[in-house]
């Protein structure tokens, strides 16, 4: 049992103002594995005051000083690798190999990318007799999701530290352990008091007062659209800057000249990775009618090889859904797909055989899906694929963009000219060609209802900066 009932405020582990706690459940076993404080407004106020007190001092640190701080964080993060991997497997249910290869590594990559971005980032620019200055925005509130406990937290923290902005972090109450380890890392390497503050709790007790606090100048949130909308409403009262990374319903366009086995393997991975709990999951797979039958045969073969099971067993590729609530939501979407007339091609409702304990879902494929069906329009956040056929490229692009979301898109094929045309035509913040992968120095964010602003690398740093023009500075 992990007992993390203290908050980290102003460089110290302190008792929460609240006597309440939140239990953390291992989704693979349905057992309580720890608890964290259920913080309240008083905790938030104390954390914001600590951050505000150090704001001017931290803002005026040099780039070299902030790079040195990030260097120390990187080294200690690497020292805590096993602790981070174990915590994520416990709280999220991610297979150990995934926790190490993806979750741990992505968190590390963002600290490195922010440090490297500072090598060439210009905080000042001369324009004739005038000067343009970019300076830290001030106290920033960070609210992070449960599906990537280190990635989503590290990318925000790294950018804020690089910019010189102190923060108050509220991690997800479902996966808070990784954030506590990050706090321990920052404490050990000597992050200045007040620069980093951790307040555990739920949205009502911590998220709301953080979003409304008059001394918080910027809110950075990753999560659902409805919650993002509420944060914007609260932040609008005093015109805070807001950065949002929200949901997605990403298209994966398969071209007719593709290697079918390669395409089936790639699209399978994009749906089952992290048990489908990925905002960029390519869950709408668009396939040319002319290769549909061959593609589906290979797709079924690829899905049949996916091993769902105990995240601590060797060979497990897919772990459980995060919670009973989320498991039930995935089941409801699968049933909705059947009700609306989509053809169940693989998987379906219920749990995989032999996995009655834990929130395990069956990887599922629907075919003959109309893009207006619920399963093709709404984010499921589970291992559920919708296969949609198209007749020509224009139709594929039209279907791909027929969504309220625009976080990511994918295309796979051989003809470079066609690949480039599709990539430029998809309305999304990130498009991957032939499984190229996303590097941590590339900007990340969404079009339409997938969010506002950009994260990662120098673009992420800029979210935590204000721009000042000083006329006549060089006269």
UniProtKB/Swiss-Prot annotation:
Classification via CDD domains: ALDH_CddD_SSP0762
Classification via InterPro entries: Ald_DH/histidinol_DH, Ald_DH_C, Ald_DH_CS_CYS, Ald_DH_CS_GLU, Ald_DH_N, Aldehyde_DH_dom, Aldehyde_DH_NAD(P)
GO terms under biological process: aldehyde metabolic process
Pfam hit, one: Aldedh
Keywords, alphabetical: NAD, Oxidoreductase
Domain of life: Bacteria
Record's catalysed reaction(s): an aldehyde + NAD(+) + H2O = a carboxylate + NADH + 2 H(+)
Assigned EC number: 1.2.1.3
GO MF entries: aldehyde dehydrogenase (NAD+) activity
Gene3D superfamilies registered for this protein in UniProt: Aldehyde Dehydrogenase, Chain A, domain 1, Aldehyde Dehydrogenase, Chain A, domain 2
Binding residue positions for NAD(+): 146-147, 223-224, 246, 379
Family: Belongs to the aldehyde dehydrogenase family.
Protein name: Putative aldehyde dehydrogenase
Organism from which the protein derives: Staphylococcus aureus (strain Mu50 / ATCC 700699)
């Amino acid at each position: 049992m992990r007992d993390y009932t203290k908050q980290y405020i102003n460089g110290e582990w302190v008792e929460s103002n609240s006597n309440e706690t939140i239990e953390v459940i291992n989704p693979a076993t349905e057992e309580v594995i720890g608890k964290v404080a259920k913080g309240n407004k008083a905790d938030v106020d104390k954390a914001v005051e600590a951050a505000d007190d150090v704001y001017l001092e931290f803002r005026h640190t040099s780039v070299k000083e902030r790079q040195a701080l990030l260097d120390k964080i990187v080294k200690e993060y690497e020292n805590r690798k096993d602790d981070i991997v174990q915590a994520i497997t416990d709280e999220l249910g991610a297979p150990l190999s995934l926790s190490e290869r993806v979750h741990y590594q992505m968190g590390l990559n963002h600290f490195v990318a922010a440090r490297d971005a500072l090598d060439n980032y210009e905080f000042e620019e001369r324009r004739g007799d005038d000067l343009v200055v970019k300076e830290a925005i001030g106290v920033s509130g960070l609210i992070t999701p449960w599906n990537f406990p280190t990635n989503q937290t590290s990318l925000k923290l790294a950018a804020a530290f690089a910019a010189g902005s102190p923060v108050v972090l509220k991690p997800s109450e479902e996966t808070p352990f990784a954030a506590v380890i990050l706090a321990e890392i920052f404490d050990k390497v000597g992050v200045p008091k007040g620069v980093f503050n951790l307040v555990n709790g739920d949205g009502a007790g911590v998220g709301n007062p953080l979003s409304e606090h008059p001394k918080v100048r910027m809110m950075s949130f990753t999560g659902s659209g409805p919650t993002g909308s509420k944060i914007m409403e609260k932040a609008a009262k005093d015109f805070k800057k807001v950065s949002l990374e929200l949901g997605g319903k990403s298209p994966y366009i398969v071209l007719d000249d593709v290697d079918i086995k390669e395409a089936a393997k790639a699209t399978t991975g994009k749906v089952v990775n992290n048990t489908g709990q990925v905002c960029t999951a390519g869950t709408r797979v668009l396939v040319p009618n002319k290769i549909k039958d061959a593609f589906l045969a290979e797709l079924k073969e690829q899905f049949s090889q996916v091993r769902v099971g105990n995240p601590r067993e060797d060979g497990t590729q897919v772990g459980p859904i995060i919670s009973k609530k989320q498991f039930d939501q995935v089941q409801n979407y699968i049933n909705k797909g059947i009700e609306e007339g989509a053809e169940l091609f693989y998987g379906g409702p219920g749990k995989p055989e032999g996995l009655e304990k834990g929130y395990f879902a069956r990887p599922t494929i629907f075919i003959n899906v109309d893009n207006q069906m619920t399963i093709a329009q709404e984010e499921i956040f589970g291992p559920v694929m919708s296969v949609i056929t198209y007749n020509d490229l224009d139709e594929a692009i039209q279907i791909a963009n027929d969504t309220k979301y625009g976080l990511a898109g994918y295309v796979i094929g051989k003809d470079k000219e066609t690949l480039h045309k599709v990539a430029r035509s998809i309305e999304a913040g990130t498009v991957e060609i032939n499984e190229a992968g996303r590097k941590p120095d590339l900007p990340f964010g969404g079009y339409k209802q997938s969010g506002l602003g950009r994260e990662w690398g120098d673009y992420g740093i800029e979210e935590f900066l204000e721009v000042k023009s000083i006329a006549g500075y060089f006269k």
